[in-house]
A protein has these predicted regions:
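Flavin-dependent oxidoreductase catalytic cores
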Residues: 1-174
């Protein structure tokens, strides 16, 4: 079985938008809440969401907090926040990973305003120091490209964050 169902509310691709999925759903908080509620009623595992902090010209704390509260009230208790807004027109998905500016502070404020939620932060995280800092304000960190580019980074995280010193060094593996 699966540990959870995760709804992706962050993908900005045209193909995904065309079918009203991904980041375009941030424009429809009531619909997202209804979907999450129905998913919660249909399964026994947690329903989580990954979303952006905004879209196009919408990057205000009040909007994001309203969106988070709607999905929280629908039964979602874990939210992964990509600390960039999604530009839905004019940028490719790859450009959406770099061009919109990171706003970690907004993620921290969402956690502060919703302490009962498990909030994970995502976006541009590439060092142990960044992870350590984010964990002061959030419940967890999601890392993508840094691990794709350097899979051994997982062992550095294991050693430095989880204090598991039984991890073999790169030299020992070779």
């Amino acid at each position: 079985g699966y540990d959870e169902v995760n709804i992706n509310l962050g993908c900005p691709s045209k193909k995904v938008q065309k079918n009203s999925f991904g980041a375009s759903l941030m424009k429809e908080p009531d619909l997202v809440a209804e979907c999450i509620s129905e998913m919660k009623n249909s399964c026994t595992i947690p329903v989580t969401a990954k979303t952006r902090i905004g879209f196009d010209e919408v990057e205000e704390f009040d909007y994001l907090n309203m969106f988070v509260n709607k999905i929280k009230n629908a039964g979602c208790k874990t939210i992964i926040l990509h600390a960039r807004k999604a530009i839905l027109k004019g940028l490719t998905p790859k450009q959406n990973l770099n061009i919109p500016k990171l706003n970690y502070q907004m993620v921290y404020e969402i956690k502060k305003s919703n302490p009962e939620l498990e909030i994970l932060i995502n976006g541009g995280i590439t060092t142990i120091e960044q992870i350590t800092n984010h964990l002061k304000y959030c419940d967890g960190v999601m890392i993508g490209r840094a691990i794709y580019q350097n899979p051994y980074f997982l062992s550095e995280i294991e050693k430095n964050i989880f204090k598991n010193f039984d991890i073999l060094s790169r030299e020992h593996v070779v």
